[in-house]
């Protein structure tokens, strides 16, 4: 009788860590991107919760008029927000150690910059983690590509726009009413509703919702019944089954007769590519539009573009929008400007004496 003994190679601590990080057998895949994603998202989430509850007012406009955003300072879930970093800080990197005290850091809105930078790094790593897991499993990389749309949108409003405008105080506040305020001010200053890229984004979001509802309802309505009338049709499905769970021919025929033949897909793969690509491309365009308007390449201006034979202006909807924009703009930062922005931009005369 012969016994064969094999020496088990001892793996270093670093090697075991690498194997654990890249293992697809874990309940939740970590990945190398996850090593950075986990601490950054935990930091952003923790600081957001603490600041939303208890942060003191922030001097957002840099004029010594603090704005309250937390629950303990009089706000509720709807009105509360993480107030953006002060205009006095501008685009400066403003960690806690750059302030003379924690009170000063809070007064100047340091938590906003901390949350935003950690959040953007975290969601970018989440996108990389999606690609990494797809690669490990031998899948195609399109899940990460689709997720790049919301990552691009978040980067546009939280980073690119403040860079273009010269201050993190112009970034989107982290709250419900703060988001709406950002949208209103953005329209007033950049006329985003008249920007073609925003129009493509609206078509992408609403069109994607419509197509998703149509697809889900068609599939649900054309299930291949494996149960009796007294049982739920869902009981006839078994996870991992090889058979089709719905009849695409029936769905194609229904939709083709409802509209016209070529309005429906007869290829499931091209159908699902379309369902993914439509909203993703639309949101890409919106993020690109925000990034261009950040540097004041604004929406179309058709103000007073229609006149009669006597040269008198015939108002169009573009003029109505322009009037609304002016009203919103004069209400924005009303204590920060003594003059309209266009007049305030003129160089002041020098004084001698």
Curated annotation (Swiss-Prot):
Tyr-161 forms a radical intermediate that is referred to as redox-active TyrZ, YZ or Y-Z. C-terminally processed by CTPA; processing is essential to allow assembly of the oxygen-evolving complex and thus photosynthetic growth. PROSITE patterns: REACTION_CENTER. The modification N-acetylthreonine is found at residue 2. The keyword Electron transport applies. The D1/D2 heterodimer binds P680, chlorophylls that are the primary electron donor of PSII, and subsequent electron acceptors. It shares a non-heme iron and each subunit binds pheophytin, quinone, additional chlorophylls, carotenoids and lipids. D1 provides most of the ligands for the Mn4-Ca-O5 cluster of the oxygen-evolving complex (OEC). There is also a Cl(-1) ion associated with D1 and D2, which is required for oxygen evolution. The PSII complex binds additional chlorophylls, carotenoids and specific lipids. The modification Phosphothreonine is found at residue 2. Residues 345-353 form a propeptide. 2 of the reaction center chlorophylls (ChlD1 and ChlD2) are entirely coordinated by water. Herbicides such as atrazine, BNT, diuron or ioxynil bind in the Q(B) binding site and block subsequent electron transfer. NCBIfam families: psbA. This is Photosystem II protein D1. It comes from Nymphaea alba (White water-lily). The lineage of its organism: Eukaryota, Viridiplantae, Streptophyta, Embryophyta, Tracheophyta.
